[in-house]
Amino acid sequence: MKEGKTLLKIKQNDTTQEIKQIIKPRSYELMFIINFNTSEKERNELIETYKKFITENNGEIIKVENIGEKDFAYPINKMKKGYYVLFDFKAYPDDVVRLQNLLKNNEKVVRFMVVRKNLKED
């Protein structure tokens, strides 16, 4: 994993200058709930899509835990249960925002939450 990430490339007089971000990847935990009516194949494809997004953006997957089917405490969109997945990963903050947008715009994802971990270690 790189230490700095290119924020902006400026081209002046046939030379390209890169402005590096001095932020290191941070540790996060992502919990998301997949619609219970989604097939196992679609669930696995969805999980792989998010894993691929993280790794393609210089992130690192530490752990993926398929918690499985659980009942909700209250109905969500007329559903009583969902399929829970937990990711532990490292990524750059701007990539986490993009990941959240992907999750938000996917109708198969009922709910999600991203939490930054290890504030003192980062």
Name each model-derived stretch:
Residues 1-82, 90-122:
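Long, contiguous binding/interaction regions
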